[in-house]
Amino acid sequence: MAKSGKDKFRIKSERLPEFISKLEDLTKISDSIKIKIESDNTMMYSILGKATVLAFKNYNIPTSELFEVKDDLEYGIDIIILNAKKFVKNLNFLKENEKVTIEITHKESQEDDTIMDARALQIVGGKLKVNWIGGEHYEIKDMNKKKLDQGLNIKNSRWSFNIDKSDFADIKKLSSINGDRILQIGVNAGKVVISETAAWEMEIDTIDAERSANLILNKKFLGCINDSDSIQFHIFDNFMLVKHEDSNLMLSFEQNWDEEDE
């Protein structure tokens, strides 16, 4: 019979707003989120697409910086949060100046005896208790941090280009005006141009003069890109990657952006 049990952690008050903000950001990809808690690292991510991953974003936070954990965990804990947008809205009523705890009721994974699958969560802060039922393990594709680090290593990218902060802000504003869902990213003789068909175009970078390419970017993912002084897009064979200090945003080329994929 599979083992079951509970774990209770305190969420560090100084990290609570950031924790909620990161969860909210992940809901821009999908309304389902997976959190993988291990002794050294906590990874949370969201995926768009079932058989094929169309978009993926994750955050990594050292577990000791997010939770107060008395001892090293002897196992990993996987939490699947369905209806994540509603979950996050509930968490926004937690107050930073109050002690906030998360209690996880779990059972041993059928596929890996070193992992516990969360069955239920209870997050308590002051007068508020947020109760949530954990999703089934098959409802979100499992992503391994080690394999992700290898697969998203920018050393394996083919080429890259940059967009500075002010240009990116203008691109988001221009994109909100016009009706197309798709932005074109064109490279001709090393000049990188982002455009919207029959509406506008903007030259945003100059790279290797011999480089030519044509890519597409769905506007809906502009809001998933974290702000920074310079945003670098790394181009791989089948996807583009925007990497920040504690996050990765992967957007696949292998899609047609049909509405049913959303």
List the model feature ranges, each with a label:
Residues 1-27, 33-262:
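DNA polymerase sliding clamps and clamp-related checkpoint/processivity subunits
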